[in-house]
Amino acid sequence: MAVQMRTMLEVADNSGARKLQMINPLGGGAGHVAHLGDVVTAAVKEASPDGTAKKGTVVKAVIVRTHKEHRRKDGTYIRFDTNAAVLINDTGEPVGTRVFGPVARELREKKFLKIVSLAPEVL
């Protein structure tokens, strides 16, 4: 099932947001479910007071970790402890300047190279 509507996501960057609630995945054909590397719209539910993202704003984010396992083409599975996302702007660049925690290799295939380069570990 991956990440569905109204799922709470941790924020894996230093944009100022701490928790997001997924509103809807962007792009056609996905229904109401988002997988690793998908772009979603989300509402900021918790934010730090000095960050750029404010509570109550609607933002775009890319899913970088999911608790539901994801099957890769070689038959292996990847699963994380949390559901997490990184905030992006309209051009697809990350809003924050740092990414915390590991991210999935699928982001490289979906052309989020800046997020992959900022991440401390790519699994």
Swiss-Prot record:
Source organism, top-level taxon: Bacteria
Keyword presence, Transmembrane helix: no
Organism: Koribacter versatilis (strain Ellin345)
GO MF entries: large ribosomal subunit rRNA binding; structural constituent of ribosome
GO cellular component terms attached to this protein's record: large ribosomal subunit
InterPro entries: Ribosomal_uL14, Ribosomal_uL14_bac-type, Ribosomal_uL14_CS, Ribosomal_uL14_sf
The protein, known as: Large ribosomal subunit protein uL14
Subunit relationships: Part of the 50S ribosomal subunit. Forms a cluster with proteins L3 and L19. In the 70S ribosome, L14 and L19 interact and together make contacts with the 16S rRNA in bridges B5 and B8.
Record's keyword annotation contains Transferase: no
This protein's UniProt keywords: Ribonucleoprotein, Ribosomal protein, RNA-binding, rRNA-binding
Gene3D superfamilies membership: Ribosomal protein L14
Family: Belongs to the universal ribosomal protein uL14 family.
A GO BP entry: translation
Lineage of origin: Bacteria, Pseudomonadati, Acidobacteriota, Terriglobia, Terriglobales
Alphabetical list of Pfam families matching this protein: Ribosomal_L14 (PF00238)
Reported function: Binds to 23S rRNA. Forms part of two intersubunit bridges in the 70S ribosome.
